[in-house]
């Protein structure tokens, strides 16, 4: 018998690994997992030199850019960076809460110019552009429980199919569809267009450049310096010819509840092949501007632990 393809073997192993973590959390509880988290986070903080440097770079940039509005009283050091890592771990636990369907102990309040209830009234769906700032899973879980519109989440990591299968095993009522993609092609666009025409919504992040084509990016100022942003989500928005919204969900450090920012971006994004990047600037300016503002107010919820400005590669 011929050996299995490596992707098949890896996919099978990843399913059981994901299922084990979800089951352990489901029965072990939040606080037990939190006890395990502290040494794990400390280990990754001590051994992850590049991630630690990226954290310190970001926190210091926020402090310098914000000036008198800085969330820090002095330049952030290694203690602030460790706390940054710690918050990443805590948010990961709350993501699992959302995935397995546990009743949250927090509330989600709307702070944007649009509410999910307004989206329910529209005949068609739309594109929700988020980021790795905050916790989109909480927003997805809230929307899934309170509203009928289906959320299709595009992810650029491996094993989305395994995750979908494991999630259904733990929480059969889960109605979040993770769609694993390596590239945005016409076949994907056609499938998503059909779903949007049926009233569903597509969630995609816009702050990281393409895994397969990092050169397909567009630059915009962010925290005082030019940074590369993904081009794919905006091209997809143009192809889908649908309403576009920005979606951010961040934990308020004062009361532990979540602030949901759902903001209308445009009714339809038109990007001609000629001068595409110039035509994109108005909506990208709005997106980067809101991302920047929220990053200053919620700096510990910035979960891009890499050189976001690509300074090390210059």
Q: Language-model features: where?
A:
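Soluble or luminal CAZymes and related metallo-dependent hydrolases
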Residues: 16, 51, 108, 184, ...
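Catalytic core of membrane glycerolipid acyltransferases/transacylases, capturing the structured
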Residues: 73, 80-83, 87-92, 122-183, ...
């Amino acid at each position: 018998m011929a050996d299995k393809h490596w992707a098949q073997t890896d996919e099978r192993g990843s399913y059981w690994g994901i299922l084990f973590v979800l089951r352990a959390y489901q029965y072990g509880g939040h606080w037990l997992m939190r006890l395990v988290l502290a040494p794990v986070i400390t280990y990754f903080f001590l051994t992850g030199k590049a991630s630690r440097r990226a954290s310190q770079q970001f926190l210091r940039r926020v402090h310098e850019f914000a000036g008198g509005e800085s969330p820090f009283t002095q330049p952030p050091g290694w203690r602030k960076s460790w706390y940054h890592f710690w918050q990443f771990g805590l948010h990961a636990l709350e993501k699992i809460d959302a995935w397995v369907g546990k009743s949250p102990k927090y509330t989600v309040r709307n702070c944007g110019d649009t509410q999910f209830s307004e989206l329910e009234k529209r005949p068609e769906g739309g594109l929700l552009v988020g980021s790795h700032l905050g916790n989109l899973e909480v927003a997805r879980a809230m929307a899934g429980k309170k509203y009928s519109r289906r959320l299709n989440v595009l992810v650029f990591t491996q094993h989305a199919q395994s995750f979908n299968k494991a999630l259904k095993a733990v929480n059969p009522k889960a109605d979040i569809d993770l769609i694993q993609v390596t590239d945005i092609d016409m076949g994907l666009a056609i499938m998503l267009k059909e779903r949007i025409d049926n009233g569903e919504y597509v969630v995609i992040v816009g702050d990281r450049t393409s895994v397969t084509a990092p050169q397909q990016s567009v630059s915009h100022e962010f925290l005082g310096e030019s940074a590369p942003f993904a081009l794919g989500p905006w091209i997809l928005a143009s192809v889908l010819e649908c309403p576009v919204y920005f979606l951010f969900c961040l934990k308020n450090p004062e009361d532990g509840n979540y602030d949901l920012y759902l903001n209308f971006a445009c009714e339809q994004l038109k990007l001609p092949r000629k001068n595409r990047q110039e035509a994109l600037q108005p909506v990208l300016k709005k997106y980067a501007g809101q991302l920047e503002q929220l990053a200053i107010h919620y700096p510990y919820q910035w979960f891009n632990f890499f050189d976001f400005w690509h300074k090390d590669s210059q």
